[in-house]
């Protein structure tokens, strides 16, 4: 496989990257406040790419919005961006919600130490 060729694998076969050791103050705070996502409807998030560069082929667009998509069992991946606004340093959590037709899903991101 050449480095620019995409290799698609089943969405349930992608294992997330291990969490790297936090180095900066922002990274340490992000780990301390580790976001959790609670979904009341729709599909659970799946990791998008693994450490070999193999990409999640996505979910089928047919069937119920929350059917057969309750997570891979390997865990998920989230990107947390921190931006210092005044002295507060809030963070924004991003995630991809697949197989949803609604603009606003029922996911709630919360933070708390674990």
From Swiss-Prot:
UniProt keywords, alphabetically: Host cytoplasm, Secreted, Virulence
Pfam families linked to this entry: NPP1
Induction: Expression is strongly induced during the first 24 hours of host infection. Levels increase from the time point on when germ tubes enter the leaf and the maximum expression level is reached during the formation of first haustoria. Thereafter, expression decreases during branching of hyphae.
Domain of life: Eukaryota
InterPro entries tied to this protein: NPP1
Location in or out of the cell: Secreted; Host cytoplasm
One cellular component term from this protein's GO annotations in UniProt: host cell cytoplasm
Cytoplasm recorded as keyword: no
Family: Belongs to the Necrosis inducing protein (NPP1) family.
The protein's role, per its UniProt record: Probable secreted effector that may act as a pathogen-associated molecular pattern (PAMP) recognized by the plant immune system. Seems not to induce necrosis, neither in several susceptible or resistant Vitis species nor in the dicot model plant Nicotiana benthamiana.
Free-text comment on this protein's domains from its UniProt entry: The structure of NLP effectors is remarkably conserved with a high level of conservation of a central region containing the conserved undecapeptide motif AIMYAWYFPKD and heptapeptide motif GHRHDWE.
Record protein name field: NLP effector protein 1
Lineage: Eukaryota, Sar, Stramenopiles, Oomycota, Peronosporales
Gene name tied to this protein: NLP1
């Amino acid at each position: 496989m050449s480095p620019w060729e995409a290799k698609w694998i089943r969405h349930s076969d992608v294992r997330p990257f291990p969490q790297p050791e936090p180095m900066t103050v922002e990274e340490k705070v992000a780990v301390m406040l580790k976001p959790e996502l609670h979904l009341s409807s729709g599909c659970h998030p799946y990791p998008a790419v693994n450490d070999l560069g193999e990409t999640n082929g996505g979910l089928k667009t047919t069937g119920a919005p929350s059917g057969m998509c309750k997570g891979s069992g390997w865990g998920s991946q989230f990107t947390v961006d921190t931006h210092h606004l005044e002295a507060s340093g809030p963070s924004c959590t991003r995630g991809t919600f697949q197989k949803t037709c609604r603009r606003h899903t029922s996911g709630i991101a919360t933070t708390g130490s674990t």
